[in-house]
């Protein structure tokens, strides 16, 4: 069984921590002050594999936000993480034939960056939408991480096409933060909140935009290195990703924990223990999948509520309504009718 993605695994590139340290210095916070506040040893940046753990990086981000007094620090950091900050993957993206090829390469190998997200590209009605869903529970770090991810995706896309993206839209899975107006300064458009997932949408014609530095030989070399990195890091598929995929493959007929464990070739006890080490439970993962599917059905289909309830494995509409209200604070009908 592959090792589950967890908070103590050294998967986050040191380059991200260095970018954070450079940024907080501009707010008058020294490197040592940040390490002291975060209770993280400076030596973590000297790791021979060039990576640090999620736990250490999250501690640094928590303390950075507190010391800098900048609520939008995630957005600011995301704008600073240019192509070169993403290492070998960044070079491959820069050398791709066009933006579409660059995105395809990134989606194939983004796990070399130690991201705590599942990413996918959805093409529909003349638009290209990049979607991001947490592959591990980030808790209080969710907003900072999502801001950083989406801001860097947008900034790099603009850099690759050589101009600010036009007719772009962006959405986030959490309620609007107090600094929500700052999002328009970054993306050039007001963000949408309380979405089923984080997303960045642009006209699909951008995917054909050629790259000035296209180099097939460089892309091939980078692909070989990315394959080697994936094998070394063993992060091709984290445990939460595998559980979610299993549940999404069986909407309306979700397995219980023991059934899921058998399909994942492990024991129920082992699955429960691994999920606990990630700060979650099987029921919480199932509820999260149900919630995301419910939001998707309500926003993208006209299915009656009783059919949505059945698709989500509820015996009747009343149980679905109670669960949905617990998840969102709203009734399904009210959510669907909201502008």
Swiss-Prot record:
HTH araC/xylS-type domain segment(s): 241-338
Record keyword Transcription present: yes
Keywords noted in UniProt: Activator, DNA-binding, Transcription, Transcription regulation
Gene3D superfamilies attached to this UniProt entry: Homeodomain-like
A Gene Ontology biological process term: ornithine catabolic process
SUPFAM superfamilies tied to this protein: Homeodomain-like
Molecular function in Gene Ontology: DNA-binding transcription factor activity; transcription cis-regulatory region binding
PROSITE patterns recorded: HTH_ARAC_FAMILY_2
DNA-binding span(s): 258-279, 305-328
UniProt keyword Transcription regulation, yes or no: yes
InterPro entries assigned to the protein according to its UniProt record, in alphabetical order: AraC-type_N, Homeodomain-like_sf, HTH_AraC, Tscrpt_reg_AraC-type_HTH
Function: Probably activates the ArgJ gene that encodes ornithine acetyltransferase. Binds to its own promoter-operator region. Probably binds ornithine.
Alphabetical list of PANTHER family matching this protein: HTH-TYPE TRANSCRIPTIONAL REGULATOR GADX, HTH-TYPE TRANSCRIPTIONAL REGULATOR VQSM
Full protein name: Ornithine utilization regulator
Species name: Pseudomonas aeruginosa (strain ATCC 15692 / DSM 22644 / CIP 104116 / JCM 14847 / LMG 12228 / 1C / PRS 101 / PAO1)
Gene: oruR
